[in-house]
């Protein structure tokens, strides 16, 4: 893996291929390896970069998180993630880059576009579970508060079951999300990673400060992506709302919420039609 030294962290990332830079931002998994099957499909067209977000995988922290980062309204980590991606983009290219964020990674991508538009050539938001600008935002914020409370008091299994039911996660995705790692060490790491995400992201990222105006001023750069196998899920409804209010196009892409793993060839074909 490659390394970028940043304030308070060493950011690790996979890099394959040649051509214009395309950065993938992972969601709850936090690590870029989930994008490697997709990267193989794109490496003849792009320099594909798949990041281990700060606090995840091989990326190393040189300073502890502030205590306030677990506050439900804290934007510390999502803003730090966005700054990391912007600094990575600048280190890799003198030109604006392509960026795709998936799930909570797409919320990070939104903050990159909002705060560092100069690094973005084109950007895609794949099934973002953000609720800030929705008419029923308070309802969804309360639901996420309840989910995190259940995880912390009744256990991860019950809380994640409620999470899947509340967001109407498709069966193809629920099966993959609940699949345990192959080794005991892997299962322990998987548990720690999911608990960290529960404490520091479910509430904070989904209710972070993004508005529809943040999209309209850069609408020519944005594509919304919805999976063909995850119809009816909450993240898809978010994209439909953005589309209705701003006119930014939605493109159907193969697979579900984890389509880049489930159907990497078809996923890549859509990206190449968009950006190739």
Swiss-Prot record:
Keywords: Hydrolase
EC number assigned by the record: 3.-.-.-
Name of the top EC class for this enzyme: hydrolase
Segments forming domain AB hydrolase-1: 20-137
InterPro entries: AB_hydrolase_1, AB_hydrolase_fold, AB_hydrolase_sf
Ranges in coiled-coil conformation: none
Signal peptide: none
GO cellular component: membrane
Molecular function as annotated in GO: hydrolase activity
UniProt family annotation: Belongs to the AB hydrolase superfamily.
Cross-referenced PANTHER family: AB HYDROLASE SUPERFAMILY PROTEIN YCLE (PTHR43798:SF31), MONOACYLGLYCEROL LIPASE (PTHR43798)
Protein name: Uncharacterized hydrolase SAR2661
